[in-house]
């Protein structure tokens, strides 16, 4: 089987064989949110998609370092502060907490989480170096702009002509060209600011990610990701200013996830159809939401509807139900004989596992990979639950474990938390206490013996019983 990983590179718009700058190490930067409002289900898709990509690369033996920034100073934050009359720091802290809570619930792991306001010194240094190399200039207002004409490859990533970029008229007069973009924005009364060689001001949007990505991953790394809406102007401008500074290729693969639509319409405030991620998680649960995000290839739009989430919920429950059968068969132990039909099942399971990896290796195609997992689930219900074959159950268990390592929707099936374990033991001990009060000592003694075999010792007293691990 060919398990070489191929990735669709937005730069060049084609599939390319995956390779890393450093052996067995993947360095990945994904653009995070601007924390001026609740993150929504569109953000959630990006978080989960790149988490699944990271998980699969780890499953394949790579060490992955994933950086995802938090933009905590921006025009939108300042506007929100002025509209509601609250300090911008208060707004940032509140919505950062919501964002981090959503990541935790979705089981999305970020290795480094830099905030823009903690990297102002590095941003100023980055801008100054661009000025020194002739790629940026200081305007009379104290703003600093990137001179797009000094970077000949501008537009390659987004397939956009610089002359067609309409940024509005406010700052056009002080620019060399209308398509130049701000690296540093001069201070206006009532806005937060930091001191710089060019006067009071704050960073532009694009310079933040260039600075923080190179700060933590170096001047050459493997994957730069984000939503498709960031390709232009954000990622185009990031690439221009960074490659202008370092003088060579910056990122190997540009990877972008497609939009979430609501009944075929794009989410927008004007349509009033934006769904906060916290509301979706509250209604559907993080595992169902994760599963639903990954039912579609990350480069294809995914449409949100009640029906789609119900289908995802049912499909995930069927996988979990198959795990109950698998565990039950495994608990019975090996039978020490194998039938021809059992061997056929082994081959089917292994073929589907191989197909799962083939799909995931082909541009992280979670949708196709998922279809092979459901083939294994079908075998569990149609064959394994009747044959009670130990080895078949073990193979199915291992396959679903690898599936979960990527999809992250069944952790409780494979890695029960101590909290859940304690609750189960407490419940058993409480039932045993009630049996003792009913003088059903034979049953209560049997429970004590079985718990002891499992490493849990019951401590009986006159009024009640407690427990401890052996």
Curated annotation (Swiss-Prot):
Alphabetical keyword list: Aminoacyl-tRNA synthetase, ATP-binding, Cytoplasm, Ligase, Metal-binding, Nucleotide-binding, Protein biosynthesis, Zinc
The cellular location(s) given in this protein's UniProt record come to: Cytoplasm
Q: Where is this motif: 'HIGH' region?
A: 33-43
Cofactor names from the entry are: Zn(2+)
How many cofactors are bound and how? Binds 1 zinc ion per subunit.
Q: What is the lineage of its organism?
A: Archaea, Thermoproteota, Thermoprotei, Sulfolobales, Sulfolobaceae
Q: What is its EC number?
A: 6.1.1.16
Q: Which family does it belong to?
A: Belongs to the class-I aminoacyl-tRNA synthetase family.
| Annotated source species | Saccharolobus solfataricus (strain ATCC 35092 / DSM 1617 / JCM 11322 / P2) (Sulfolobus solfataricus)
Name of encoding gene: cysS
Its recorded name reads: Cysteine--tRNA ligase
Which CDD domains does the UniProt record give? CysRS_core (cd00672)
């Amino acid at each position: 089987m060919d398990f070489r990983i191929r990735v669709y590179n937005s730069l060049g718009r084609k599939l390319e064989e995956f390779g890393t700058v450093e052996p067995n190490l993947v360095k990945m930067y994904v653009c995070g949110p601007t924390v001026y409002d609740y993150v929504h289900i569109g953000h959630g898709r990006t978080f989960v998609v790149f988490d699944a990509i990271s998980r699969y690369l780890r499953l394949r033996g790579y060490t992955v370092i994933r950086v995802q920034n938090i933009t905590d100073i921006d025009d939108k934050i300042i506007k929100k502060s002025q509209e509601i009359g609250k300090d911008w720091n208060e707004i940032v802290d509140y919505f950062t907490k919501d964002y981090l809570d959503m990541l935790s619930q979705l089981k999305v792991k970020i290795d480094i989480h830099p905030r823009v306001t903690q990297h102002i010194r590095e941003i100023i240094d980055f801008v100054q170096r661009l000025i020194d190399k002739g790629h940026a200039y200081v305007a009379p207002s104290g703003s600093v702009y990137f001179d797009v004409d000094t970077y000949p490859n501008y537009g390659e990533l987004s397939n956009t002509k610089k002359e067609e970029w309409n940024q509005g008229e406010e700052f056009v007069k002080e620019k060399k060209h209308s398509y130049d973009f701000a690296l540093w924005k001069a201070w206006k009364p009532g806005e937060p600011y930091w001191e710089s060689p060019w006067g009071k001001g704050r960073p532009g949007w694009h310079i933040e990610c260039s600075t923080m990505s190179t700060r933590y991953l170096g001047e050459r790394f493997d994957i730069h990701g984000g939503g498709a809406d960031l390709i232009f102007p954000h990622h185009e401008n990031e690439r221009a200013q960074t490659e202008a500074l370092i003088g060579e290729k910056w990122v190997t693969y540009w990877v972008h996830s497609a939009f979430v639509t609501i009944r075929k319409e794009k989410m927008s405030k004007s349509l009033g159809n934006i769904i906060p991620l916290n509301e979706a998680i509250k209604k559907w649960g993080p595992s169902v939401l994760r599963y639903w995000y990954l039912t579609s290839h990350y480069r294809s739009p995914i449409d949100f509807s009640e029906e789609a989430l119900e289908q995802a919920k049912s499909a995930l429950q069927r996988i979990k139900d198959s795990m109950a059968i698998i565990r039950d068969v495994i608990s019975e132990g090996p039978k020490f004989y194998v039938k021809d039909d059992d061997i056929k099942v082994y081959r089917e399971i292994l073929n589907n596992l191989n197909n799962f990896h083939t799909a995931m290796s082909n541009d992280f195609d979670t949708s196709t990979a998922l279809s092979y997992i459901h083939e294994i689930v079908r075998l569990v219900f149609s064959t394994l639950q009747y044959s009670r074959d130990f080895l078949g159950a073990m193979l199915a268990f291992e396959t679903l474990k690898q599936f979960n390592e990527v999809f992250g929707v069944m952790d409780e099936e494979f890695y029960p938390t101590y909290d859940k374990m304690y609750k189960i033991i407490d419940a058993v001990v409480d039932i045993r206490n009630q049996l003792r009060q009913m003088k059903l000592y034979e049953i209560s003694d049997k429970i004590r013996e079985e718990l002891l075999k499992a490493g849990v010792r019951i401590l009986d007293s006159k009024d009640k019983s407690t427990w401890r691990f052996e």
